[in-house]
């Protein structure tokens, strides 16, 4: 497995090298503050501590981040010594095990978490649709990182202009 530590993935009958972009987004502004590129076989939860800036009070994530706060490398306090709350979406199968009233409360809670997480998904949408980054042309993590390091600030500019009405 050479091309700079990309994992080998099969799509249909074609074998390709896969990479994954992990990034942190500010929950208030919706702008990207950190970026890591790994091979595709690295799980999301292993990159949690690298994506935190130290200013966070609450960390939101999808069900791929379940158990992030229990890991050995987990950051439990921010730079100011305040405990970080991890608000991770549950899997739907976990919600089905609850009573009817418990399901109602859990779904409401999950909806609130998902509404914050939508800012992360919006950044993905901008990168994929506005900048047409669906398939990479480069092999190697360093080249992927360089390309994404160029695209994410552009996405930040686009999103900042739309959210805050900044004129350039």
Task: List each model region and its residues.
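C-terminal domain-tail junction helix/linker
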Residues: 146-152, 162-168
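Polybasic low-complexity intrinsically disordered regions
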Residues: 1-76, 82, 149, 154
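Composition- and surface-driven signal marking solvent-exposed, interaction-prone regions
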Residues: 37, 138-140, 165-168
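Helix-centered, glycine/charged polyanion-binding patches within enzymatic domains
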Residues: 53, 57-58, 63-142, 146
């Amino acid at each position: 497995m050479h091309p700079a530590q990309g994992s080998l993935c099969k799509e249909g009958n074609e074998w390709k090298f896969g990479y994954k972009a992990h990034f942190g987004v500010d929950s208030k502004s919706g702008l990207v503050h950190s970026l890591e590129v790994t091979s595709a076989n690295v799980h999301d939860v292993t990159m949690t501590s690298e994506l935190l800036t130290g200013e966070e009070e609450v960390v939101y994530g999808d069900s791929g981040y379940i158990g992030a706060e229990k890991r050995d490398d987990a950051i439990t306090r921010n730079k100011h010594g305040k405990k970080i709350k991890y608000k991770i979406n549950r899997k739907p199968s976990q919600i089905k095990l609850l009573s009817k009233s418990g399901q109602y409360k859990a779904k409401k809670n999950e909806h609130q978490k998902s509404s914050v997480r939508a800012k992360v998904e919006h950044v993905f949408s901008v990168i994929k649709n506005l900048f047409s980054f669906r398939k990479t042309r480069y092999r190697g993590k360093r080249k992927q990182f360089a390309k994404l390091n160029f695209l994410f600030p552009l996405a930040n500019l686009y999103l900042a202009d739309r959210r805050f009405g900044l004129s350039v």
